[in-house]
A protein has these predicted regions:
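Class I S-adenosyl-L-methionine-dependent methyltransferase catalytic core
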Residues: 1-178
Length: 178
């Protein structure tokens, strides 16, 4: 995995050995941050990477100017790898081994951007959206990004879809709370 932009552009990160982790493709990462850049100033903003897996989205966020990174994953090996990669870059962040939905039920921090990329064959994206709207974790004018398999049904009740993109077998949705 290689960071595609910002301060740490072209820096290589250690990839997870486990096949269950699917790092977001570089062209998708570039698109995400180009779209975000057109909508918000990254300075003094917090990026929450739910279902962090490889953590590449959070590292891209810090590289491109976000001030704070929170990465949540329930796999201890993934969290260990995230901490190693953060250390190699000299990045401070919160790397938490915890269930993402439980984290959303009792958030410790307010955030500006939430990236949701759960395992594709689950309903975790919809469940996460329910928790976000119910528990007030997102700052005013915050943005949620969901990466999901193409044709996956997402319930946008309570949200406004501000942008939708398709990249082969995956869709990206950019949302705000209505």
């Amino acid at each position: 995995m290689i960071i595609t932009g910002g301060k740490y552009r072209s820096r290589k990160l250690i990839s997870p050995a486990e096949k269950i982790v699917k790092p977001t493709l570089s062209k998708v990462r570039e698109s995400v941050f180009n779209i975000l850049y057109s909508r918000i100033d990254f300075k003094d903003k917090t990026f929450l990477d739910l279902f962090a897996g490889s953590g590449i989205m959070g590292f891209e966020a810090i590289s491109r100017g976000f001030s704070t990174l929170i990465a949540i994953d329930n796999n201890a090996n993934n969290i260990t790898l995230l901490k190693k990669n953060a250390s190699s870059l000299g990045i401070d962040g919160k790397f938490i081994k915890y269930d993402a939905l439980k984290y959303l039920k009792a958030p410790k921090d307010k955030v500006d951007v939430i990236f949701i990329d759960p395992p594709y064959d689950t309903d975790l994206a919809n469940l996460a959206l329910d928790e976000i709207i119910n528990n007030g974790i997102l700052n005013k004018d915050g943005i949620i990004i969901i990466e999901t398999r193409k044709n996956k049904q997402i319930d946008f009740d309570g949200y406004t879809v501000i942008k939708e993109c398709n990249y082969g077998l995956c869709n990206l949705y950019f949302l705000t709370i209505s």
